[in-house]
Every structure is written in C-alpha cells, then in structure tokens.
C-alpha cells in the first residue's frame, strides 16, 4: 500500500524495520489511530477496514471501520486476528501493550497520547511504558477505605472484583473497559500496581481523560 506511505509518515514515526507486504503500525492508548483510520477511509473510500475491537456505527456515507468478519485492506487490533482471514490486508494497527497475542515488528510507531495527561505518563514510565502528552491530568493514590470513588470504577484483580460485588457496586474489569474512555476513573486494585499483570494494568491505567484515583 505504497500510496499510504506518505500519509503514515505525517502522523507516525518510521522505524528501521524494512518494508514488507504488510505495514505494521503500533501506538499507545489514545494516540488517535482510530481517527487516522477513519480519515484514511474518507481519502480512499475503496479501502475496507476491520477491527477486532468495537466497530463504527453504520452511517449514511456507507463507510467506516467494520467488524472483524470478512476480507480487509486494513486491520485494527491485529494481535487478536488471524490475518489469513483477511487476504487483502496491507496495513495493520494495534496498541500492542493492550494485547496478549503475538505482535510483529513495527514499521511506524506513535508514543504520544491525546487521551490522558502528563501525570499518567509519568506513572506509566515507572512501569516501563514510555509515552508523552501535552495535557495535564491528575493521578492520586489512597487506601481502599480512605477515599470515595470518583467517576467510573475499574476492578483490577479477583479480590477487588469480590469486594465490589459484595458491595453491589457496578464496575468494569480491564477486559470490559478495553476501547472505552471516561473523564474520571477510580481503580480498585487488590495488589500494588507494579505487581499486577502488565496488560490488565496498562488497560486499567489508560481509560481516563482527566483524573485517575487508585485505591489499594
């Protein structure tokens, strides 16, 4: 898909990985890859894009990011895919930190997020995840019974889920929260953040736009 190469270079950083039949693009959460794919479809309406995440709602224009079923030129969240199901694929996208599946070497990357802010980037940095942001947000730690939850609740760990179930409080698990964004998130974790599984931890820490309260 040579005609997209210039477009990719305007938005993503080219790595030293040699060209291959399928171009691989890796981004951090909130980088704008979904918007980029939608704009690519506007500029090239002959393309078909499919996602292993949440597809777009059908629209009057007749194009958007479709569900996973069928051939495609573009596949989003590709670590969850069997690319043999998409023989025409030329570009694949993913935030590889959100997946357990095998990932390919990236031709293009983006480590800048438009979702959360600098405080979250600093926290992620202590966990080995490098990303940048131009905006401000807040990250606060507190004891599980010493602060009131704010916004949407995410439970990290089975014991955290059990506590919220016993209190009949609605919450998301990281798997359920994947692909969702909320202004404020309260994360109840049953172990120190650094001891939690990396994929679930990363998803849970990147769902908010303004504030994150971590209760342990």
UniProtKB/Swiss-Prot annotation:
(+)RNA virus helicase ATP-binding domain location: 1-110
GO molecular function term, any single one: RNA binding
Superkingdom, taxonomy of origin: Viruses
Cellular localization per UniProt: Host cytoplasm
One biological process term in Gene Ontology: transport of virus in host, cell to cell
Domain (+)RNA virus helicase C-terminal: 111-216
Record keywords, A-Z: Host cytoplasm, Host-virus interaction, Inhibition of host innate immune response by virus, RNA-binding, Suppressor of RNA silencing, Transport, Viral immunoevasion, Viral movement protein
GO CC annotation terms, alphabetical: host cell cytoplasm
Function noted in UniProt: Transports viral genome to neighboring plant cells directly through plasmosdesmata, without any budding. The movement protein allows efficient cell to cell propagation, by bypassing the host cell wall barrier. Increases plasmodesma size exclusion limit. Acts as a suppressor of RNA-mediated gene silencing, also known as post-transcriptional gene silencing (PTGS), a mechanism of plant viral defense that limits the accumulation of viral RNAs.
Family: Belongs to the Tymovirales TGBp1 protein family.
Remarks, miscellaneous: TGBp1, TGBp2 and TGBp3 seem to act together for cell-to-cell propagation. TGBp1 is the main movement protein that physically cross the plasmodesma with the viral genome. TGBp2 and TGBp3 would facilitate TGBp1 function.
Subunit field text: Homodimer and homooligomer. Interacts with capsid protein. Interacts with host AGO1; this interaction targets the host protein for degradation, thereby suppressing the antiviral RNA silencing.
The protein's name in its UniProt record: Movement and silencing protein TGBp1
Taxonomic source organism: Lily virus X
